[in-house]
Amino acid sequence: MSKEDNVINNFEEQANELMKERFQKLKELQSNGKDPFDVYKVERTHTSKEVKDNYEDLEGKTVTVAGRLMSKRVHGKAGFSDIHDRYGKIQLYIKINDVGEEKLKEYKTFDIGDIISVTGTVFKTKTGETSIHITDFQLVCKSLRPLPEKWHGLKDPDLRYRQRYVDLIINQDVRDTFIKRTAIIKSMREFLDNRGFLEVETPILSPIAGGAAAKPFITHHNALDIDMYLRIATELYLKRLIVGGFEKVYEIGKNFRNEGIDIRHNPEFTAIELYEAYADYNDMMEITENMIAYICEKVLGTTKVEYEGAEIDFTPPWRRLTMVDAVKEYAGVDFNIIKDDIEARAIAKEKHIEFKKELKDCTKGDVLIGLFEEFCEDKLMQPTFICDYPVENSPLTKKKRGNEAFTERFEGFVFGREVCNAYSELNDSIVQKERFMQQLKERELGDDEAYMMDDDFITSLEVGMPPTGGLGIGIDRLIMFLTDTHSIRDVILFPTMKPQPNNQ
């Protein structure tokens, strides 16, 4: 058994003993007619922040606050305590002359983690700390399970995620991260709403998993007796809305991909997709860099952020680099002079590039993508748009003007990681059907992430979709950068976890 396991087991043993004591205290309260769970509402007049921010107006006046008891230093006939609410902590002062001997005795029985309401007058201590001089109090929830005293000392990589409620209680920086998350998404909506975009909702359950190259989650609809998929992207439904005349739309929501879990990937994640009629991928670059700059200024007050010790500058314009130029710069391979698939495969073999399918089935475009992923991605530290992807790897995208071997697609990279993906959207129904047919062949070759045929989407394109620019951003990854967070699990309140055995 590891040292960390011993620490955890010792804490659990101590917790079990403390829980017995707390259960006994609860029984005594209930027998005395003071059951905290009979409290239905607290008439709170102020939060901790409001008391501190308005001290000059509140000095000497009576307020009622409520929160979780997080420290208690009461000995003899007086003492101090701290309670925490959503906005932070505030100090309490209790004295026997103000509440009486019995009430002080009751207060001393309270445990760390209990939730109380307090009425008292506002004052400042000799050290200048805004505090509340208690005249009355009430226990409104008894905490039966003790909080760990040294949460980070447990060194259990999973425990903070499994018991996020405790993590939020103990760690102010964790609360701050999720408050920033809300502000980031709010600012994103604000930016798009100001530009005339319409927020919409599209299905999460669908008979076809489309819009991205990914493995879906499969479920079964009993009433219809059909298999359905949790969406892997919102793209194809949003494009249907462009066909329907909604010229600027976006959706912020959950996508689901039945793939691996690591510091950058969670099976359930939040993304935004937006589409604008009569626009192209150049317009999507402008929206991307200006929206992220807007969010940075709004939430952080600057477009220069620190991430893992490095400064990232989100100030527009971002660097623009074609994939061919990136591979030439970082891998030393000039695809402008490579003639065909055979020559490209020889380079892939020389560079030891691995693919999901056999090398003999790889195209020149497959090799270009492979070289980019192997040699270029981790070099792209500052915000960079990598443009013009091979046509065989971008089935929903218009061909590049002037070079039909490529498409008008870009991905945005920051700190060596992809954060967004955008196209000049393909709106030719005939070509789109051909692309889907080619994707079906890829599935037959073993690529289970290749696109499925979506006949209804083809039908919508036959009705007619105007030239359109589309953009998708992984919100969780963006939040990681803007909060200097290493793992995606630290920006998702309840990340996907493997269930624990029943006895743990």
From Swiss-Prot:
Listed EC numbers: 6.1.1.6
Places the protein is found: Cytoplasm
Binding note for cofactor: Binds 3 Mg(2+) ions per subunit.
Cofactor(s), by name: Mg(2+)
Keywords: Aminoacyl-tRNA synthetase, ATP-binding, Cytoplasm, Ligase, Magnesium, Metal-binding, Nucleotide-binding, Protein biosynthesis
PROSITE patterns cross-referenced by the UniProt entry: AA_TRNA_LIGASE_II
Chain positions recorded as Mg(2+) 1 binding sites: E411, E418
Superkingdom to which the source organism belongs: Bacteria
Catalytic activity: tRNA(Lys) + L-lysine + ATP = L-lysyl-tRNA(Lys) + AMP + diphosphate
UniProt xrefs under PANTHER family: LYSINE--TRNA LIGASE, CHLOROPLASTIC_MITOCHONDRIAL, LYSYL-TRNA SYNTHETASE
Any one GO molecular function term: magnesium ion binding
This protein's encoding gene: lysS
Family: Belongs to the class-II aminoacyl-tRNA synthetase family.
NCBIfam families named in the record: lysS_bact, PRK00484.1
InterPro entries in alphabetical order: Aa-tRNA-synt_II, aa-tRNA-synth_II, aa-tRNA-synth_II/BPL/LPL, Lys-tRNA-ligase_II, Lys-tRNA-ligase_II_bac/euk, Lys-tRNA-ligase_II_N, Lys-tRNA-synth_II_C, NA-bd_OB-fold
Protein name: Lysine--tRNA ligase
Summary of subunit composition and partner proteins: Homodimer.
An annotated GO BP: lysyl-tRNA aminoacylation
Residues holding Mg(2+) 2: E418
GO CC terms, sorted: cytosol
Enzyme superclass (EC): ligase
